[in-house]
Amino acid sequence: MALDPAEQHLRHVEKDVLIPKIIREKARERCSEQVEDFTRCCKDSGILMVLKCRKENSALKDCLTAYYNDPAFYEECKLEYLKEREEFRKTGVPTKKRLQKLPTNM
């Protein structure tokens, strides 16, 4: 039984694991300023980071939560996943492997 590359049905693991992974990665990219602020605060504060970095942690959580709860952002990530899956089903090559550069000394 061959899989149809253009099929839109999502399995449980795709809905609950793979698409949320894409959402987390893209949200971290879009909240990079808050991620950097929180990381810097943690590095500078050491053990006291729990107390000293509350403001940065709250800003980071607010930014990430806004993306996690945005239905349009979920659909954008879902379409990106479906496109990657369709390409994989056509070529058999995962996206990460396709993006790697070929050696130049061949």
UniProtKB/Swiss-Prot annotation:
<keyword id="KW-0496">Mitochondrion</keyword>
<comment type="function">
    <text>Component of the MITRAC (mitochondrial translation regulation assembly intermediate of cytochrome c oxidase complex) complex, that regulates cytochrome c oxidase assembly.</text>
</comment>
<dbReference type="GO" id="GO:0046872">
    <property type="term" value="F:metal ion binding"/>
</dbReference>
<dbReference type="InterPro" id="IPR013892">
    <property type="entry name" value="Cyt_c_biogenesis_Cmc1-like"/>
</dbReference>
<feature type="domain" description="CHCH">
    <location>
        <begin position="28"/>
        <end position="71"/>
    </location>
</feature>
<comment type="similarity">
    <text>Belongs to the CMC family.</text>
</comment>
<protein>
    <recommendedName>
        <fullName>COX assembly mitochondrial protein homolog</fullName>
    </recommendedName>
</protein>
<feature type="disulfide bond">
    <location>
        <begin position="41"/>
        <end position="53"/>
    </location>
</feature>
<feature type="modified residue" description="N-acetylalanine">
    <location>
        <position position="2"/>
    </location>
</feature>
<comment type="subunit">
    <text>Component of the MITRAC (mitochondrial translation regulation assembly intermediate of cytochrome c oxidase complex) complex, the core components of this complex being COA3/MITRAC12 and COX14.</text>
</comment>
<feature type="disulfide bond">
    <location>
        <begin position="31"/>
        <end position="63"/>
    </location>
</feature>
<keyword id="KW-0186">Copper</keyword>
<keyword id="KW-0479">Metal-binding</keyword>
<dbReference type="GO" id="GO:0005739">
    <property type="term" value="C:mitochondrion"/>
</dbReference>
<keyword id="KW-1015">Disulfide bond</keyword>
<feature type="short sequence motif" description="Cx9C motif 2">
    <location>
        <begin position="53"/>
        <end position="63"/>
    </location>
</feature>
<keyword id="KW-0007">Acetylation</keyword>
<feature type="short sequence motif" description="Cx9C motif 1">
    <location>
        <begin position="31"/>
        <end position="41"/>
    </location>
</feature>
<dbReference type="Pfam" id="PF08583">
    <property type="entry name" value="Cmc1"/>
</dbReference>
